[in-house]
Amino acid sequence: MLHYPQIDPVALHLGPIKVHWYGLMYLFGIFAGWYLLRYRAKVKSWAPIKPEQAGDLTFYIALGVILGGRIGYIIFYNLPYYFHNPLQMFFLWDGGMSFHGGFIGVLIAFALYARKLGVNFFDLGEFVAPVVPIGLGAGRIGNFINGELWGKVTDSPIGMIFPTGGPLPRYPSQLFEFFLEGVVLFTVLWLVSIKKRPRYLILGLFMFLYGSARFICEFFRQPDPQYGYIFFNWMTMGQILSIPMIVLGAIILIIVFIRTRKNKCENI
């Protein structure tokens, strides 16, 4: 059995202000995202933005992630609780963000920013997709430090006893998600993105691979107590929300493949 590192969720005390690791992980993801978007805007001739516009784009994305992620968590996972405790909606440092809600928020942000600049919505998604796993991985580290979203009970040697997870060891599912959604997804997308490839291949890969990684990790993660298993005594809310991403990603990849075979897909 592995030992869960007892890390104080509060990284810094600035007088009465508590700076949480969870928030710092989001700040790291935002800053790293801005840096990489600026770099990509410099080196990609097809980039839909100029390097100096990376800050504005990052602001739109961050707003979409935070608002969409929080609203999505409230609606998808815990609406009755927040209905009776409305002020808790604003306590972001306690955790409670939904990737799928954040994804919807980012799509809305893309639409607004693309309209503002007069650029193609899908080109913007293709441009940003390789950078997204940085933020996903950072968020999962924040979950791990908070000791939340732990996995199912296990007798595996990699099990951990979490402070809020009861006396039995559980899978460190946050680290599984950090590895698949963060490290693996970033590595694959970045390596593909630095080569000549059909347009929108990265966008399709991101949606398909993220949805698949999340679907797999949900088998190790403890279901949300307010829902449990929704279908077949094994399917969770996270898996249900991932299915549309997998399907849409597969459709994009099939279209890219067909257009490539017919020499109708531009390489970028």
Curated annotation (Swiss-Prot):
- In this entry, which stretches build a coiled coil? none
Topology of this chain in the membrane: Multi-pass membrane protein
Entry GO terms, CC: plasma membrane
Q: Write the record's keywords in alphabetical order, separated by commas.
A: Cell inner membrane, Cell membrane, Membrane, Transferase, Transmembrane, Transmembrane helix
The UniProt entry's GO biological process terms, in alphabetical order, are: lipoprotein biosynthetic process
Write down the PROSITE patterns for this protein, in alphabetical order. LGT
- Gene Ontology MF terms: phosphatidylglycerol-prolipoprotein diacylglyceryl transferase activity
What is a single Pfam family found in this protein's UniProt entry? LGT
Q: Does the keyword ATP-binding apply?
A: no
Cite the binding residues for a 1,2-diacyl-sn-glycero-3-phospho-(1'-sn-glycerol).
R140
- Specify the domain of life of the species encoding this protein: Bacteria
EC numbers: 2.5.1.145
Record-annotated membrane-spanning stretches: 17-37, 57-77, 90-110, 117-137, 174-194, 200-220, 238-258
Q: In which pathway does it act?
A: Protein modification; lipoprotein biosynthesis (diacylglyceryl transfer)
Q: List the disulfide bonds.
A: none
The UniProt entry lists the main location of this chain as: membrane
InterPro entries attached to this UniProt entry: Lgt
Asked whether the keyword ATP-binding is assigned, the reply is: no
Q: EC top class, in one word?
A: transferase
Task: State its location(s).
Answer: Cell inner membrane
Similarity remark: Belongs to the Lgt family.
Q: What does it do? A: Catalyzes the transfer of the diacylglyceryl group from phosphatidylglycerol to the sulfhydryl group of the N-terminal cysteine of a prolipoprotein, the first step in the formation of mature lipoproteins.
State the name under which the record lists this protein. Answer: Phosphatidylglycerol--prolipoprotein diacylglyceryl transferase
What is the species of this protein? Answer: Francisella philomiragia subsp. philomiragia (strain ATCC 25017 / CCUG 19701 / FSC 153 / O#319-036)
